[in-house]
Amino acid sequence: MSTPANGKGRISQVIGAVVDVEFDGELPSILNALETFNNGSRLVLEVAQHLGENTVRTIAMDSTEGLVRGQPVSDIGTPITVPVGPATLGRIMNVIGEPIDERGPVNADTYMPIHAQAPAFVDQATESEVLVTGIKVIDLLCPYAKGGKIGLFGGAGVGKTVLIMELVNNIAKLFGGYSVFAGVGERTREGNDLYHEMIESNVINLEGESRMSLVYGQMNEPPGARARVALTGLTQAEYFRDVEGKDVLFFVDNIFRFTQAGSEVSALLGRIPSAVGYQPTLATDMGALQERITSTNKGSITSVQAVYVPADDLTDPAPATSFAHLDATTVLNRAISEKGIYPAVDPLDSTSRILDPMVVGEEHYEVARGVQQILQKYKELQDIIAILGMDELSEDDKVTVARARKVERFLSQPFDVAQVFTGSPGVQVKLEDTIKGFKGLISGEFDHLPEPAFYMVGNIEEAKAKAAKLMADAA
């Protein structure tokens, strides 16, 4: 039985992020929030286990340095509650909803608990409409569904964060609705960059109305905060969906850190690990989060989640568990990034539920499959090329290889958010221009253009202009 709010306890043991609290009366419920004060600031603890008759084991949401045994703790009586609604827009908050942008308190009228049930099956809605991103390789080969769940998979340093930033930039700017960005266990510098990028593009307006709220629990935070910050962001997105009936964009960078923090917490709680050292509740934890990210009859949540792939192994339990929940998967490949092709999306490994002629139309489907076919053929010929050289190929195969190399380069694209590094301005390409360009490429219409003309351009007209410039320079 749970204790009434304000049950009093005292700290009996502190081991890193795990704090044991003794209560004389009834114990607080599992997932209840407890609060104490550490060096003058509020510290929230979340109940994880009941030990014996009068002790609970809790996970701290902030550093436990400075806590002492015997220190008083009070039970709030509910799970962690965070501010939701329009007051959160344009603000940066931490896992417990406190502002960390030095712009005063968040004056929200409504607070909601971060733990909630997923919407009932009958309330869920599915629609199959393409969400155009302006990024050629995504729109053509693994189109995103409005109200769907999208995963960006990649190892260390292949461009997940740059791609998610570009998606925030392209979609959140054009998108009239609200967006929520949850930074889970990633670099503080990137969080800071995103904030300033959003201010520059007026998605966050410091004086007027903003369209995005940010929730950060970065790499330096204890595991309790990293394991819960995605739920804090999701709670804010759910409010806009359920109460205000809005279509919401929900970005998470990085969902792997949520799993990683869960694994750290699990080890601290003394649970026996499962495969590769992950927590035994890996699938349950992931399911509890992912099932809440869905579209209902009231509104939709379209989520884009970056998923770090440890050691580039897609069969690792953490990325493998998240695959099952997604509508579209965009896989980033180190071999492609080594060729200097960015975004380094693997055109043969990336999939989408809506790449279907009934949804995207016959022409789009045929062109996408044609592109994949030509790239697959090139992949099969690479062994022969490596051993015998290009000269041993048949004439048809030589044409296929030449086209495939152009297709590969045409799948690259300069990004707005990378402009400071590359010096070339970013471009967004309309879906019809993307289809037109690739249709011409695979049918041989542009066989006369040189390969470099297709690298880091937007639509096919830009490639033609670049080819003319290259020829003029060579003359």
Swiss-Prot record:
GO CC annotation: plasma membrane; proton-transporting ATP synthase complex
EC number(s) from the headed UniProt entry: 7.1.2.2
Annotated ATP binding sites: 154-161
Highest taxon of source: Bacteria
Compartmental location: Cell inner membrane
PROSITE patterns registered for this protein in UniProt: ATPASE_ALPHA_BETA (PS00152)
Keyword Nucleotide-binding: yes
Pfam families: ATP-synt_ab, ATP-synt_ab_N, ATP-synt_VA_C
Keyword Repeat: no
UniProt membrane topology term: Peripheral membrane protein
Molecular function GO labels: ATP binding; ATP hydrolysis activity; proton-transporting ATP synthase activity, rotational mechanism
Quaternary structure and interacting proteins, as annotated: F-type ATPases have 2 components, CF(1) - the catalytic core - and CF(0) - the membrane proton channel. CF(1) has five subunits: alpha(3), beta(3), gamma(1), delta(1), epsilon(1). CF(0) has three main subunits: a(1), b(2) and c(9-12). The alpha and beta chains form an alternating ring which encloses part of the gamma chain. CF(1) is attached to CF(0) by a central stalk formed by the gamma and epsilon chains, while a peripheral stalk is formed by the delta and b chains.
Sequence similarity: Belongs to the ATPase alpha/beta chains family.
Name of the protein: ATP synthase subunit beta
Lineage: Bacteria, Pseudomonadati, Pseudomonadota, Alphaproteobacteria, Hyphomonadales
